[in-house]
Each structure stands twice: as C-alpha cells, then as structure tokens.
Amino acid sequence: MGFVEKMFEQTVKDVCGQTKIEYGGNKIEFKGPYKRLAFFDAIKEKTGDDISKMNEDELVKYCKSKNIETNKSMGRGKLFDAVFGEFCEKELIQPTYITDYPIEMSPLTKKHRSKEGLTERFELFINGKEIANAYSEQNNPIEQRKSFEDQMRLAEKGDDEAMFIDENFCTALEYGLPPTGGWGFGIDRFTMFLTDNNNIKEVLLFPAMKPEAVSYTHLRAHETREDRV
C-alpha cells in the first residue's frame, strides 16, 4: 500500500504540478498516507449495522429491508458486495484503502493469517470508483479447490460470473507456488483523473467503436443491376 501511495502521489505531482486535483466537482488530495478501512467496518460506519456474521438468508432479508435488489443466484459474496456498493463505494471520494475482504468475495486470495473468515486483500477507491486491487495469492491447492467448488455451487444456482474448477491451475499449485502477491490498477480511470475527462473513450488509445450505421438507401445506391435481379 505504501508503494501504491508513493506512485500515485508522485505521478499526480509530476503531471499536474501538485498533489491536489479537481475532478467531477470534487477536490481530491493524492498526498499520502491514504485512509485505511476494513470492509465490514466501512459498511458499519455508513449503516450502523454489523453484517459480517449474517448467513445468506439473513443477508437477503437485510438487503430487502434496505431496498437493495437481489436474486436467487446471489451467494454471501455478492450480497456483501451489493450492500457495500449501495452504501459505501460512491462515498469514497478521497483515496481510501478497503481491506480485509470476506473469503466469499475473493476466491483466488489467501486467507488472512490472523482474521478468520477474511482474506489478505485490499482495493483502492478514488472518487467512488475502484482504482486498484491487490492480494496475496492462494497457494494451497486444497484450499483453492474448495474455493472453486464453492464457486461451482454458485454457478449451479445461476450465477453466470462464478468460476469453474480449473484443473490445470490446481495441478500447478500441487507442484508448488511460493508466497506470491500482486496488484493491478485501472490506468485508464487514473488517466481520466489526470486529464479531467469524464469519458473513458477519450483516454483510450484504441477505443472500441460501434460500426457506423449504413442506411438502406445507401446500400441500394451501390447495388449493381445483377444484385437486383
């Protein structure tokens, strides 16, 4: 997290001449250190409720009481995420680390070494958007297979985003993976901040564009006599 802070702070300073910028009507300070907040603490801070021990049925009832839309395919992970998205995400304007995500939201992540039910993962949010995601990789093949099996059960319920059991990956882990971690960040979203752009297509080198609509009259004008016979 310290590395990420230093990189973001220095990049903003080099590009903009200072560490504070204005984007979307918000003044954002990139100078570290950034606020750190555990996932369930962030939810409790906004709602006053501790939902960390709720089972699936209790979470569904809780979501309904808060007018959060749910469906039968949602497991604990997606229900937790729905609550966080409703009450917390859009409120994280200043750079903020959300840490200690629940296991159900992080199927490839190593379990937290001292906090039961949580993982060694953080995400960085700025201006209500996720900008970076990082975690310790799960390198225990037995635990990883269990996570994949949990994902398969969600897929059977209708979750089209659930993972499948990756046999090749599990086999590779059985040969051994040293302690590993990594992070990635949305460079396009970050560039939007630096250039004060609210359209991501404006900062993509090769944005995906829909083909220009061609009218029926235009097509008829270019048909040959043989085409019309």
Label every model-predicted segment:
Residues 1-11:
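Short amphipathic C-terminal alpha-helix that caps PH/PH-like domains
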Residues 10-13, 48, 127, 137, ...:
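Short, well-ordered loop/turn and helix-capping segments at boundaries between secondary-structure elements
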Residues 13-129, 147-177, 215:
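Metal-assisted phosphate- and nucleotidyl-transfer catalytic regions
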Residues 104-108, 132-133, 139-142, 191-192, ...:
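Flexible loop/turn segments at secondary-structure boundaries
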Residues 130-133, 137, 178-193:
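Conserved phosphate/anionic-ligand binding catalytic regions in large, soluble enzymes, centered on
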Residues 174, 191, 197-213:
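Acidic, carboxylate-rich catalytic segments that either coordinate divalent cations
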Residues 217-224:
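Conserved small/polar residues in nucleotide/adenosyl-binding loops
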Residues 228-229:
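Hydrophobic alpha-helical segments, chiefly the membrane-spanning helices
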